[in-house]
Regions:
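Structural motif
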Residues: 32-33, 142, 166
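CN hydrolase (nitrilase-like) catalytic-core segments centered on the catalytic cysteine
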Residues: 56-79, 151-231
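Extreme N-terminal starter segment of soluble prokaryotic enzymes
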Residues: 1-5
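Short, acidic/polar
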Residues: 15-25, 151-157
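Active-site catalytic loop in hydrolytic enzyme cores
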Residues: 85-162, 176-183
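Short polar catalytic/cofactor-binding loops
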Residues: 8-14
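Cys-nucleophile CN-hydrolase/nitrilase-fold catalytic domain and related Cys-dependent amidase chemistry
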Residues: 20-99, 103-104, 174-187, 191-194
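Hydrophobic residues at beta-strand termini and immediately following loops
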Residues: 7, 105, 135, 199, ...
Length: 231
């Protein structure tokens, strides 16, 4: 039976000791794939807005090096959302780190809201043709979507057409949205005959944004089989 470890964290410190501990525990418990939520490798979006570029770059590069090192050390695949610092901008990516290398998925649709305007901050380009990022894990056909992208039918049409087994969704859901997210993802799973693993962030920012966790696995019948709390 294939196992996947969903690690529910706030933003991690630059030290890799905590990540090392939980990756080892994941491997010891039989998981070969580990998934992190959004803004765990990096500070949360509202904090990035006020951070110097060199500090964001240091944070990103140090964490990426740790992921590469630990993936090799424990022979793991690791999925981790990541802020890439470009020459004149930033991009919001999700890394898929394996012992053999790194692939990245660039988020295709970003949040445009006044209080959370990723579309303005990041330089990601929306391609004329949206395509899902697929990979196989122990004979399971997987797709990677950012939380916000789960709202858009175009991705689910492709997921249905390609008969995907599992949709992996790193997220940073906050405010009073817990119930809405559960209902959205249960509906998506049921209507598209696919399982969903949503891995959410926890913690609280300085401006009182509270991330409630609720990492969960939903089967293809739209039923929540397991979920974590708020810690």
């Amino acid at each position: 039976m294939s196992k996947i470890a969903a690690l529910q964290f706030p933003t991690l410190a630059l030290s890799e000791s905590r990540l090392d501990y939980y990756l080892k525990a994941s491997k010891d418990n039989g998981a070969n794939l580990v998934v992190l939520g959004e803004y765990v490798i990096n500070s949360f979006f509202t904090e990035l807005l006020h951070m110097p570029k060199n500090m964001i770059k240091e944070q990103s590069e140090a964490k990426k090096e740790s992921l590469i090192k630990l993936a090799k050390k424990y022979e793991l695949e690791i999925i981790a959302p990541y802020v890439s610092v470009e020459a004149k901008s930033y991009k919001k990516l999700c890394l898929k780190v394996t012992p053999n290398g790194v692939k990245s998925y660039e988020q295709q649709i970003l949040m445009p809201y006044e209080h959370w305007n990723e579309e303005k901050f990041f330089s990601n380009k929306t391609p004329s043709e949206l395509k899902i990022f697929t990979f196989n894990y122990e004979k399971i056909k997987c797709v990677l979507l950012f939380g916000f992208e789960t709202h858009f039918d175009i991705f689910w049409q492709q997921i249905m057409a390609k008969k995907i087994d599992l949709v992996i969704v790193p997220s940073a859901c906050t405010f009073e949205s817990k119930q809405r997210w559960e209902e959205l993802l249960k509906t998506r799973a049921f209507l598209n005959s696919t399982s969903i693993l949503r891995v959410n962030r926890i913690g609280k920012t300085k401006d009182e944004w509270n991330f409630y966790g609720d990492t969960l696995f939903i089967n293809a019948f739209g039923e929540i089989e397991s979920k974590l709390g708020s810690e």
